[in-house]
């Protein structure tokens, strides 16, 4: 999954973490690895994140916060920043989507949207 906005491209890869999940207790742990590419000619800094997480029962949760994994990275032109985080769902299927608030070298804010991506245990969907 990939989203391109302005000079920023966001790629997402997900993984079900079976060893830390407990389906009998409705606990499904997923990791997601995000790569943010700066395709522009100026530095960009990730300031804030916003996630909307929905499980297959329609339960929604929102996450707002400063930076990602404790950092507010500045990404140089033609470079990327990669991190891994995770979320727990009560169902074996869900979706996440959101956005990053970025700041360019002029101090102007812009949103880098993150298209919806699926969180699913292996073999659930074809």
Curated annotation (Swiss-Prot):
PROSITE patterns: APAG. InterPro entries: ApaG-like (IPR050718), ApaG_domain (IPR007474), ApaG_sf (IPR036767), Uncharacterised_ApaG (IPR023065). It holds the Pfam family DUF525. SUPFAM superfamilies: ApaG-like (SSF110069). It comes from the Bacteria. Residues 2-126 form the ApaG domain. NCBIfam families: PRK05461.1 (NF003967). This is Protein ApaG. It comes from Shewanella halifaxensis (strain HAW-EB4).
């Amino acid at each position: 999954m990939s989203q391109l906005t302005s000079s920023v491209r966001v790629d997402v890869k997900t993984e079900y973490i079976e060893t830390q999940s407990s389906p009998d207790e409705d606990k499904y742990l997923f990791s997601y690895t995000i790569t943010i590419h700066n395709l522009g000619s100026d530095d960009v800094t990730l300031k804030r994140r916003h996630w909307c997480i929905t499980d297959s029962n329609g339960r929604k949760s929102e996450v707002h916060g400063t930076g990602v994994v404790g950092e507010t990275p500045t990404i140089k032109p033609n470079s990327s920043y990669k991190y891994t985080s995770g979320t727990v769902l009560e169902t074996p299927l869900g979706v996440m989507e959101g956005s990053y608030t970025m700041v360019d070298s002029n101090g102007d804010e812009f949103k880098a949207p993150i298209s919806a991506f699926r969180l699913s245990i292996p073999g659930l969907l074809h």
